[in-house]
Amino acid sequence: MRRSVTTTIRVEWGDCDPAGIVYYPRFFHWCDVATWNLFAACGLPLIELQKRYGIVGFPLLEASATFRVPSRPQDLIVIATSLGPLRRKTLELRHAFSRDGAALLEAREVRVWAHHDTTRPNGLRAAAIPPEVVARLTASAPP
């Protein structure tokens, strides 16, 4: 069974638009927070990955979301994040947002293991995800 993690977020007034509901980009920010919480739970914090492997990180290739119910200030949101398909250079993450057990949003991200590409300005290049990183991401969660 692949790793999963939960992240809890309290919606603040500043997260909302003039209608008093969460402004949609905030959900993508919270997906990013939850993604790195999953990596940290696997013993793979971003700073350590950058130092050890010289990567930029796991930039997004795709991001999508299906919105079910609006969220408002002071809502306590739980994000259940799990690893989806893992390929040679990319991985998929799935985020299920809920409030009091009710589904709010489902989001999906595809990220790529990336290094700087020194042959072009601001360039990135995809590389294979190291086997030890794959092993940590796919290991069963400790009891």
What are these regions (language model features)?
Residues 1-60, 116-143:
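Hot-dog-fold acyl-thioester-processing enzymes
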Residues 7, 67-76, 83-143:
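HotDog/MaoC-like acyl-thioester-processing domains
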Residues 23-27, 66, 96:
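Intrinsic disorder/low-structure terminal segments
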Residues 52-75:
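A contiguous binding-surface segment within folded domains or other stable secondary-structure elements
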